[in-house]
Amino acid sequence: MAKRLRFAVVTPLNHRVVLTRDRWREIVRYKHPALTGHDGDVQDCLRDPDRIRASVKDPSTHLYYRTLAHCILCVVVGGEDPQQRFVVTAYFTQGLKTGQDLWKK
């Protein structure tokens, strides 16, 4: 049975990234409740980020950043296949993690 998608977007790196409904529910219920109602911002961050960095711990994990009015949104994306990447988590932050820049606006 296919997982139900909340959305799928193509990033500036030409990667297809998906977010399932179950994963989004887990993020906003248990990990980062402040993101409730911000799924549109998560999509925008993936489509039109300010910066994309590779994780220091795992270079195949990418961190997408977009500045909002009150903070910075970070969307963490995993997966090896550029056409089958997925949202691991997302959160609000005040700064960027260290890592190699892959793309900048």
Enumerate the language-model features and the residues they cover.
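Ribonuclease/tRNase effector modules and their secretory precursors
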Residues: 1-105
